[in-house]
Amino acid sequence: MSDISVEKLTELEAAAELERLARAIAHHDELYHAKDRPEISDAAYDALKRRNEAIEAHFPALVRDDSPSRRVGAAPALATFAPVVHARPMLSLDNAFSDEDVRDFVGSVYRFLGQLPDDSIAFTAEPKIDGLSMSIRYENGILVSGATRGDGTTGENVTANIRTIAEIPNRLPAGAPAVVEVRGEVYMAKSDFLTLNAQMEAEGKQTYVNPRNTAAGSLRQLDAKVTASRKLRFFAYAWGEMSDMPVDTQLGMVEVFRQWGFPVNPLMKRFNSVDGLLAHYRAIGMERPTLDYDIDGVVYKVDRLDLQTRLGFRSRSPRWAIAHKFPAEQALTILRGIDIQVGRTGALTPVARLEPITVGGVVVTNATLHNEDYIKGIGQKGEPIREGRDIRIGDSVIVQRAGDVIPQIVDVVLEEGKKRGEPYQFPHVCPACGSHAVREEGEAVRRCTGGLICPAQAVERIRHFVSRNAFDIEGLGEKQVEFFFNAEDPALCIRSPADIFTLKKRQENSLTKLQNIEGFGATSVKKLYDAIDARREIALHRFLFGLGIRHVGEVNAKRLARAYLSYAAFEKAALEAVPPKEGDRTDKGSEAWQDMLAVEGIGSIVAEAVVDFYGEPHNREVLAALLAEVTPLDEEARVATGSPVEGKTVVFTGSLERMSRDEAKAMAERHGAKTAGSVSKKTDLVVAGPGAGSKLAKATELGIEVINEDDWFKLVGED
């Protein structure tokens, strides 16, 4: 995740980051909701979503069709449980992280409803249970189904397992509405979790990580007897479809649940003021360590149901509710050292080496220090950071697991009488190649000027060059790139992109054969050569993206390719583009410069990056060698002709086993087809894998052709 403030992002940088965030959040949604194997903390996940929402708020025109703000959770991943389409979607809640966020939420409710006096709207406040969301359906008082949230629209049918939870009644009392969907959270008590782990340890089996994942895994057991043995519990707090509403308030409905025999949280209360909500939030936070269940915040809801109806919903969340999350966990440790890492674009990033400390159940040894200003304690505009306290080796520091995938240092604790180390001097020379490291005006990052001669950048740039959305060369993963880069034999080494395409020829004239080296073999080497040869012709936008020009991500590469249509035209423009002289308001720059700025979405920052790249003689040498081996296809000629799917709209659904979603999309586009995320009358073809649910059902209903993954490969001739 970028550390550039949203206000400083260009439109192009924002679009590229939204694309990265959409992929990252979808990945973590699948791990959390569908596989119960989260890789990052809740705080880190929340930070990704906050960043996405902040960028979308600042650039509303860039909101993507696959934006995380338009979806909930992840589609069910297991084909062992039948899909269940929720009568009413199970939406997630927006998050608040500060008192000010809560005041903004309450204010937005009053503004939306209008003309209501202060403190006239009541809100409920209840703990946010860290478990698995569940919808339980009753018809004529009888429990007929239980389903997980899934992606909010379609969940998994876990009825047999739900029936084993003692706290969930199989029948409702007489007088209950004919159709009732009770929603709440399935969880495992901390005490039961400890007992289960003690039992597993005594039996010599692997213990479980945490109650939430254990509860989710227990609920997805194919054998309901296993679920029954896990002592799962339930809190009711919401509802889906109801044939008749017994009461007219949120608190009243929860009381009805209690009367029907459902457990409800005893800490739920109603307040008429923001101060009351915040006081209860703090009270629950104080009580949190003593509770026998995990919570990660407090949920506030408008109490009157008629006001909830008026407020309605956004695309993925209600306007009448919000989750006030607890702050990330922190710990105190010692800063033992500061290392400088050099990234693909030459950015010098400081990383703290810490005395090992446990934060939120995870042992932390490294933390981000962001940039040199953050270490100094003074921002770009002279504003103080941490009240102006700098960070020095040997300091006691507060580490927080939040925001980034790796933790961060949020403060320094100065101990009276303790002598501090010397102020940290941020290097002005690249530690990887010795080139000068410069910091451009207005930027927080210092960068190496070494380009492809810098080993740190060269390896990363080659990895980027062969990555999926660039040249996509199968068989050249991270380890292989590092092997070839570090190879001393001239017949094996790959130090620049062109070296990839001369590898086979160099091998033919060498005594050192790649297939004789450990980790390679005749078959894998042939596949590698075939994969390389398959990319000797490449789509123009992939070629441009693969060059690793700063600020030219996937989005900008496609924009430039569509604008110039051929590589020759683009290169000519890049070489002829001359920006205006600094301080000369009458100078508009060369005609080629003005033409580049006229490309939709391309601003001066991107244009300058392109001009700087082509203005470097070493880069032009690298390009000349590459163009001797590779032909970038003209944009208008790059789509396959004569393909049976050319011009058609294709939807991929279910679990794909032979390719990822990105690969499927790329393959479809390569054959002239368009891909869509949902099925409609405009859809021509649906490719369905195991676990296909609502999209498959809709395709069948509309009479749209449906094929499996193997048939897709045969259809496009890539079997």
UniProtKB/Swiss-Prot annotation:
BRCT domain location: 640-719
Name of the gene encoding the protein in the UniProt record: ligA
Enzyme Commission (EC) number: 6.5.1.2
EC main group: ligase
Keywords from the UniProt entry: DNA damage, DNA repair, DNA replication, Ligase, Magnesium, Manganese, Metal-binding, NAD, Zinc
Name recorded for this polypeptide: DNA ligase
Binding annotation for Zn(2+): C430, C433, C448, C454
Required cofactor(s): Mg(2+); Mn(2+)
SUPFAM superfamilies recorded: BRCT domain (SSF52113), DNA ligase/mRNA capping enzyme, catalytic domain (SSF56091), Nucleic acid-binding proteins (SSF50249), RuvA domain 2-like (SSF47781)
Molecular function per GO: DNA ligase (NAD+) activity; metal ion binding
Family note: Belongs to the NAD-dependent DNA ligase family. LigA subfamily.
Organism: Brucella ovis (strain ATCC 25840 / 63/290 / NCTC 10512)
Source species, domain of life: Bacteria
SMART domains on file: BRCT, LIGANc
Entry GO terms, CC: cytosol
A biological process from GO: DNA replication
Active site: K128 (n6-amp-lysine intermediate)
Binding residue positions for NAD(+): D42, A43, A44, Y45, D46, S92, L93, E126, R149, E185, K301, K325
The protein's role, per its UniProt record: DNA ligase that catalyzes the formation of phosphodiester linkages between 5'-phosphoryl and 3'-hydroxyl groups in double-stranded DNA using NAD as a coenzyme and as the energy source for the reaction. It is essential for DNA replication and repair of damaged DNA.
Catalysed reaction equations from the record: NAD(+) + (deoxyribonucleotide)n-3'-hydroxyl + 5'-phospho-(deoxyribonucleotide)m = (deoxyribonucleotide)n+m + AMP + beta-nicotinamide D-nucleotide
